[in-house]
Curated annotation (Swiss-Prot):
The organism's place on the tree of life at top rank: Archaea
Manganese listed as a keyword: no
Protein name: Small ribosomal subunit protein uS11
Similarity comment: Belongs to the universal ribosomal protein uS11 family.
Keywords, alphabetical: Ribonucleoprotein, Ribosomal protein, RNA-binding, rRNA-binding
Length: 131
């Protein structure tokens, strides 16, 4: 049998509307290989969640992963979830696209946003938000 030349890792992408955080771990998730956040690549706080910041982070992450010997990534996308937003922010899709363009092999892409089974009490009180 041929020797496996690929080494896989997991890219955890947390994408909210305020920030995007990418962490690369080994397959067990126990050892962190590299990580980056929006504040590390842009100056203004309002740009931390932008697709541009996500692309720059993904390029840095891909380079650091290759230096450590990782050739492929499984991707786990997470939004804030629970009582907050359940859809990922604008940086998630841009980060995945930039990782594949940077030469990383993409394995599985899964959504790991926490979803409540009974929900928590909604923000805004009994009468709701009055506009």
């Amino acid at each position: 049998m041929a020797e496996a030349t690929e080494k896989w890792g997991i890219a955890h992408i947390f994408a909210s509307f305020n920030n995007t955080i990418i962490t690369v771990t080994d397959l067990s998730g126990a050892e962190t290989i590299c990580k980056s956040s929006g504040g590390m690549v842009v100056k203004q706080a309002r740009n931390e969640s932008s697709p541009y910041a996500a692309m720059q982070m993904a390029i840095n992450i891909a380079q650091a992963s290759k230096d450590k010997g990782i050739t492929g990534l499984h991707i786990r996308v997470r939004a804030p979830g629970n009582g907050r937003q359940r859809s990922p922010g604008p940086g998630a899709q841009a980060a995945i696209r930039a990782l594949s363009r940077a030469g990383m092999r993409i394995g599985r892409i899964e959504d790991v946003t926490p979803v409540p089974h009974d929900s928590i009490r909604a923000k805004g009180g009994r009468r709701g938000r009055r506009v």
